[in-house]
Amino acid sequence: MKILVIRRDNIGDLVCTTPMLSALRQHFPQAWIGILVNAYNAEVLYGNPDLDEVFVYRKAKHRAAGSSKWRIWLETARLMLRLRRRGIDLAIVASPGGERYARMVGARRIIRDKPGQPAHEVERCCALLAPLGLPLAPGPLTPGPLTLRPQPRVVQRLQLAWAAFPGAPGPVLGVHVSSRKATQRWPAEAFAELIRRVLESGQIGRVLLFWSPGAAHHPLHPGDDEKAAAILAACAGLPVLPVVTGALAELVAGLSLADLVFCSDGGAMHIAAGLGKPIVCMFGDSPPAQWHPWGVPHVVLQTPARVVSAITVPEAQQAITQLLPLAGRAGSQP
């Protein structure tokens, strides 16, 4: 049996699909299982033990400078032809808009995404397996954990850079300061004050600072270089290590070196959950019931205003204090 899963949206969405991939492999151990993803999110599948093959296409909006839309479309058409020649028995469409790809590859059977179901994204993905006789959600069985593996060579490179970085004994806090949605953004001043508080109080030994790289006004990939620089300047003299993540593999590896993580709802939050980290997560107008960190200790911060900027620094510090007893020491050894 040849099964193709189609997941063509964002990083966190793909991470939330990994328990469904594990369930497929568990119940169909001899099947060939492939997945079609986009170039933006593909690296989170590095080393995934449940997949035989990963097929990557590039969205036109993510094309490199000098690359035309026609070239992107031609490459995608060639990929669809390759998959069609595989003779796909079953396509599982795990995200909206993916059904046309299932038709293009000529899948003999298609299980479609059903948007609008009131469940966590992990449970919604696993519910797609119900037609195959796998009552994972809703049902008596709970979906398993997320699956995410950092690339060892990237982890080692970051550890070497970290070895010469001063810091006090104690847990390592990963802080990710970026979010695509305006309602999910916390001010640079608030991040800086929180970092100063947890370091000066001795609660935290070191801080790893993460952000989306690039200029704020970049037309395709707006980033937070200026915001990160402002936070670092406000925390000068403190053990705050900037972690530049030009590739998704670097974000995964960097977060793997933290003991607990503070961030807004988004891809970094789901990556941290996939790495087993306790998480304090700030939610704006997204529903935590659908998107909270899966399978790890976490504290959700959300105000009645449904904007992250309304969350106070003392509230954030209290949540970190609450999770500290559950923090490991993943990052404490270089």
Model-identified regions with their sequence ranges:
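Catalytic machinery of carbohydrate-active enzymes
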Residues: 1-334
